[in-house]
């Protein structure tokens, strides 16, 4: 079945012959589900391509994609086929046994990256936890560091577990969760002098910097691309000192930047990097990749019950193969240029409200002026009313992360809907 057929079916779903189910209730939901999200008053029930529909039947153009996760959009035929095939074949067994789908996916990643080894898990936070553990063991057993320190960046985001909120250089994610995990130190992003100073200052007694964990492009921190010169100097520092260079590619990796991996924009290779979000196209899966020299894990030192299961790996492999077979990276580059051009044209019409457009491929941010009360959430709410889903990246940046299959016509439609939303909130 083609994607266009799926979209048509989602637009005009067949009427159910059974009795109507109870209407969706946000009150019932809120009474049952923990309040870990500040949710918009919108309940989505189906999707196809770059479109989703709410429980009232209203259609939206989805430029959130599960926050940079639905690589191939919703109900893509390749994913539908892979899900159906794998669930009928084998969906879960323990990692005590060899899992062919896991091996195939690992080999695909290795063939399409700088990695030599892969560890599979279920999310970006888990992948970053694995990277932190691997770096710490390497520090103890290879670098002979008694108390290793990992440098991370201010305004970074690495996950919601206790170690990854500590790695995250944003105090708002750490509030109320003391005591935090020791062994992290923050430096300003794209500031090489801050890195050099930290390495010098922290080299005292049993303490030494063992690794640097950083995003090629800061996503939650406001869609801020890394500077090429900065990252190349980071690589040189790590080569000179033995410090591990680790990249968090959870949001920018798997083609979202227009290249398969964000590090390809920067002209350097990490020793360790992580992936999740777009890897499974919306099916939960994460991965931590490393060069052979720093693969120091032994059996029993790290594990995941669900990580690398046949179902997730089988679907993720289909996503990866579809990216390659359909040359989707070229679409990401073309549509990204179109989107940024359109956003800049809109920004020029609102010079007192909109200050900058930035990003790579199909991860882009529209920054609002700091000296006005208008927030990213205000724009997102207005866009929802117009039928466009967007997501904030901090209080002053509106983020655009559509599925990588988005079309030229859909970009144009999104830009028109955004203009309507902006006209409302700036009136």
From Swiss-Prot:
Q: What residue spans carry the region label Disordered? A: 1-23
> How cofactor binds (record note)?
Binds 1 pyridoxal phosphate per subunit.
Residue(s) carrying N6-(pyridoxal phosphate)lysine:
277
The protein's matches in Pfam families, at most eight in alphabetical order, are given as: Aminotran_3
Q: Write down the PROSITE patterns for this protein, in alphabetical order.
A: AA_TRANSFER_CLASS_3
What InterPro entries does UniProt report for this protein, alphabetically? AcOrn/SuccOrn_fam (IPR004636), Aminotrans_3 (IPR005814), Aminotrans_3_PPA_site (IPR049704), Class-III_PLP-dep_AT (IPR050103), PyrdxlP-dep_Trfase (IPR015424), PyrdxlP-dep_Trfase_major (IPR015421), PyrdxlP-dep_Trfase_small (IPR015422)
Q: Which cofactor(s) are needed, names only?
A: pyridoxal 5'-phosphate
Main enzyme class: transferase
- Pathway(s) where this gene product acts: Amino-acid biosynthesis; L-arginine biosynthesis; N(2)-acetyl-L-ornithine from L-glutamate: step 4/4
- Describe the family membership recorded for this protein in Swiss-Prot or TrEMBL: Belongs to the class-III pyridoxal-phosphate-dependent aminotransferase family. ArgD subfamily.
What is the protein's name according to its record? Acetylornithine aminotransferase
Source organism of this protein record: Nostoc sp. (strain PCC 7120 / SAG 25.82 / UTEX 2576)
